[in-house]
Amino acid sequence: MEKYFFSKNYKETKSAGNKAKTDIEEILLTNGYKNVGIRSNYKGSLMGFIATLLSLLKACLSIQPNSVLVLQYPLKKYYTFLCRIAHLRNCEVITIIHDLGSFRRKRLTIEQEVSRLNQSDYIIAHNDAMKVWLQEHGVTSKLYSLGIFDYLSKSTPQPNTNKDQYRVLYAGALNPKKNPFLKQIGAIIKSYKFNLYGSGFEAQNKFNDVINYKGFVPSDKLISAAEGDFGLVWDGDSISSCSGELGKYLKFNNPHKTSLYIRCHLPIIIWSKAALAPFIKE
């Protein structure tokens, strides 16, 4: 029995979502899985589209009967196509979920997403909360919980020698829609410093000298030189709870920044109602 996974064009590999996907591909390769797609990094939409189509063609020609195919979800319209090709050849499909479109971007209804996912034989959800949510909304595939994403890096965290104020580190995509709470947090910081890493933060959002915007730093460099004593996992429009659609998503989602913080050897501050809160406490 052959073991496969499908790779495609990634416009960039520095984002949390694509880093998680490429890490999983590396892990699958080391465990004897073969790539039936073509991994590429074209930034242009046209070249990226052509590269992904070539990946699909290669997959159609490469998948052997009675094999196993691992897909990383979401995969847009290609997901259903690949599931059907695999099942026509009596293959089993294992789906690793990275994001749920019906939650985050609202591009799919819950019914549409459940219908897609039910084309997989096995599904690996982020955690038990996501697993239960999928079951309650009609997913009939066999479900398993990941626990937490791996974070591959050759970098080594340096010993923390900070003896001054505690420093809270927040890393990720910084934009008003995803983390509007950042506009409020500067006003309440009294006894610690707040270091922001990522792109999209406007200079005028700096409220006082305790907020230090570091800009975008590649993850390998951040791991070896993180300026923080704690890593913050938070989304939404409030500093008292993770409210709003993206904030509520933390009840089911495993933010990849959590894995990054662990890789940086940072203790984690997280919303008590987040799906990962029990894992952090444990």
Could you tell me what each predicted segment is?
Residues 46-52, 87, 91, 139-144, ...:
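Active-site regions of enzymes building and remodeling cell-envelope glycoconjugates
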Residues 51, 100-115, 152, 250:
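Nucleotide-sugar donor phosphate/pyrophosphate-binding loop at the beta->alpha transition
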Residues 151-224:
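Conserved catalytic-core segment of nucleotide-activated headgroup transferases in glycan assembly
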